[in-house]
């Protein structure tokens, strides 16, 4: 049986039943695995709690390593690492920032894998990522997965905010605004989105 790690334990540990899994399989606690975390920053927010205090309190493992950090962040990466430590208290944790551009995000994915991370997680979206082909971030993910790593992105953060439908061509090429109104019986090629009264949305 493994007790909770540190002063505070994430509710997610119980919600996903990883606490029950550790009880049922006490020899499996993440030992021998390094988890790589990508987010904004790890130890630069200026808050009273720091990486050092988190390690002292048992909220992070002593084996925590920071490959690169980002000045002025919220230390969300450290919060993610605390959750990882609750779920897999035996795992080592490694952090690299994803907040200095697409290329550096991609490079840090590879850097984490090269440094030994076998499980890598991120919670970062760039609106400029390509939608219909693999950009540098996706290519880096493909590379580390091909090398044996497992990669998880926080798709659940925006999982209900997408739109999926069968593609219908507009029949035009290139820039085609303003869009003409559809005639009766035409196959719709614009997205049928309905907003409730008083609702707002950001379309990207």
Task: Name each model-derived stretch.
Residues 40-45, 55-128:
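Subtilisin-like peptidase catalytic core
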Residues 26-31, 86-88, 112-114, 144-146:
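Extracellular/periplasmic catalytic domains that process cell-envelope and extracellular macromolecules
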């Amino acid at each position: 049986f493994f007790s909770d790690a540190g002063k505070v334990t994430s509710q997610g540990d119980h919600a996903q039943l990883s606490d029950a899994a550790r009880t049922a399989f006490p020899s499996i606690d993440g030992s021998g695995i390094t988890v790589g975390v990508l987010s904004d920053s790890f130890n630069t927010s200026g808050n009273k709690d720091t990486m050092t205090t988190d390690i002292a309190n048992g909220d992070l493992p002593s084996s925590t390593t920071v490959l690169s950090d980002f000045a002025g962040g919220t230390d969300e990466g450290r919060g993610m690492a605390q959750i990882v430590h609750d779920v897999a208290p035996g795992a080592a944790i490694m952090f690299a920032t994803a907040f200095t551009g697409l290329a550096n995000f991609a490079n840090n994915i590879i850097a984490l894998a090269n440094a030994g991370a076998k499980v890598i997680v991120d919670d970062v979206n760039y609106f400029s990522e390509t939608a219909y082909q693999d950009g540098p971030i996706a290519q880096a993910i493909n590379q580390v997965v091909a090398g044996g790593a497992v990669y998880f992105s926080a798709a659940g953060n925006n999982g209900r905010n997408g739109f999926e439908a069968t593609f219908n061509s507009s029949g035009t090429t290139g820039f085609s605004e303003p869009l003409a109104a559809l005639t009766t019986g035409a196959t719709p090629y614009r997205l049928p989105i309905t907003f409730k009264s008083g609702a707002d949305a950001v379309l990207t």
